[in-house]
Amino acid sequence: NLSEAVQAALYAPSAGIVDPWRFALAMAETAVENGVQLCLQSPVTAIGKTPGGFCVQTPRGAYEARYVFNAAGVQADEVHALLEAPGYAITPSRGEYYLMDKSQGAQVGRIIFQCPSQSGKGVLVAPTVHGNLIVGPNAEPVPDKRDVGTTGAGLAYVRKTALRSVPGLNFRENIRNFAGLRA
């Protein structure tokens, strides 16, 4: 079902797909089983060095830790600045997606990525573990680190670009659209 305009491909037999939500939950469960204390809904307000590591302050209290991993995504620069002089600033990139109905799932059997551009990793058409297709993302710099809304222009770009790879996609079989931010 690939476009006849496709001239070459890179076959990566080790590539795979996962359910990203279940994968993230499994990683959190594994971390807890190995002694990690999750402090959910606890924004970090200060970080200080201590003889044993670090003290992380939140509205819910202070937490002592030997190690602190800054996994704050697009807010990682703000968390970094709580401990060190600001050294960088993150401008998030919004990526918009289509989640297609299972009726479109047979269009591709592998992850189809286009070549990346200067602005992003490229638009993909990929099967999901549930038999659907996921299509996207675009890459649009946004100033607001909470802006995960979709736009008509962004989704039109994703649709047009994906059709260059898989021209038989029926975007009327779209279940939902969503967006995320990348650092």
What are these regions (language model features)?
Residues 58-67:
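Core beta-strand elements of the Rossmann-like FAD/NAD(P) dinucleotide-binding domain
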Residues 1-40, 45-52, 57, 169-170, ...:
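Flavin (FAD/FMN) cofactor-binding and adjacent substrate-gating region
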Residues 53, 62-63, 72-183:
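Active-site substrate-recognition segment that forms the wall
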Residues 8-9, 67, 132-133:
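Structural motif
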